[in-house]
Curated annotation (Swiss-Prot):
Cellular compartments annotated: Cytoplasm
Residue positions binding (R)-pantoate: 61, 155
UniProt key word Signal: no
GN (gene name): panC
Pfam families named in the record: Pantoate_ligase (PF02569)
Binding-site positions, ATP: 30-37, 149-152, 178, 186-189
BP GO terms, sorted: pantothenate biosynthetic process
Quaternary context: Homodimer.
Keyword terms of this UniProt record: ATP-binding, Cytoplasm, Ligase, Nucleotide-binding, Pantothenate biosynthesis
Protein name: Pantothenate synthetase
Listed EC numbers: 6.3.2.1
Keyword match Cytoplasm: yes
Length: 282
């Protein structure tokens, strides 16, 4: 696997593949890779001739009091894991390469409406940072396909909307959330949890599963949410949000919606965890 922080080197290699009529899939990450990330790489490998990955801890998507400096950097281990999963090219730029004029002077991309809700409301500017870096990486790599995890459901929808609105010729693939044995969604931030907290955190997925059963049984949305919030709080979480949306439009869910998504964000101690579950009702 070739590892480079050079934009021109990435473009040169991708062009060489394209001149041979070969396809390229892209998996952007922030590093500290786990099985969930590697599943994305393997999915990318199954869909294209070549896989490009990136590792960039994007300062634009972190808020003032968030864990940018503490976010784990594990490049050597990540490189080994990416090779095993099938990546052939790894882009590891520095902030000065991505934002040479600084973030304040950087042109940005913002997807309206969806970016201001749920995670966007809790983390102002987060999705602007996500959309900007993903747009920039897409312009650098110019992939045929890009693969993302469904664990970050709102992020996935933001990216799909951006690609559609800006007429980018890229197919966006969402891959089902990979979970630990307890049901806890795999996340780089799980490393912040103690063993006891990890066991407590399994309540998130258990609660989502129970909510799905209640929705399929015809229980009212507000009642389902209210009961679930109590269960999450009783497990030691501080609720950020818990909501049910139309899985396609992201509007508030209606009983007539055939496909809904339950979304949750909650704090276990100082660690913010997110999860979601898609529920097909018809």
């Amino acid at each position: 696997m070739i590892t480079t922080e050079s934009i021109s080197a990435i473009r040169k290699q991708v062009l060489a593949w394209r001149l041979k009529g070969e396809t390229v899939a892209f998996v952007p990450t922030m590093g500290n890779l786990h099985l969930g990330h590697l599943t994305l790489v393997r999915e990318a490998k199954s869909r294209a001739d070549h896989v490009v990955a990136s590792i960039f801890v994007n300062p634009m998507q972190f808020g003032q009091n968030e864990d940018l400096d503490a976010y784990p950097r594990t490049l050597s281990d990540d490189q080994s894991a990416l090779v095993e999963a099938g990546a052939e090219l790894l882009f590891t730029p520095t902030p000065s390469i991505i934002y040479p004029k600084g973030m304040e002077a950087q042109t940005f991309v913002e997807v309206p409406l969806i970016s201001d809700q749920l995670c966007g409301e809790s983390r102002p500017g987060h999705f602007r940072g996500v959309a900007t870096i993903v747009c920039k990486l897409f312009n650098i790599v110019q992939p045929d396909i890009a693969v993302f995890g469904q664990k970050d459901f709102q992020q996935l929808l933001v990216i799909k909307t951006m690609v559609e609105d800006l007429s980018m010729p890229i197919e966006i693939i969402g891959v089902e959330t990979i979970r630990e044995d307890s049901g806890l969604a795999m996340s780089s931030r799980n490393g912040y949890l103690t063993a006891a907290q990890k066991q407590q955190a399994a309540v998130l997925k258990q609660t989502l599963d129970k909510m799905a059963i209640e929705l399929r049984a015809g229980k009212q949305t507000d009642e389902v949410i209210s009961t679930a919030k109590q269960a999450i709080s009783a497990a030691g979480f501080d609720n950020d949000y818990l909501d049910i949306r139309n899985a396609k439009t992201f509007n508030k869910a209606d009983s007539s919606d055939a496909e809904q998504v339950i979304l949750v964000a909650a704090y276990m101690g100082a660690t913010r965890l997110i999860d979601n579950l898609i529920v097909k009702l018809k």
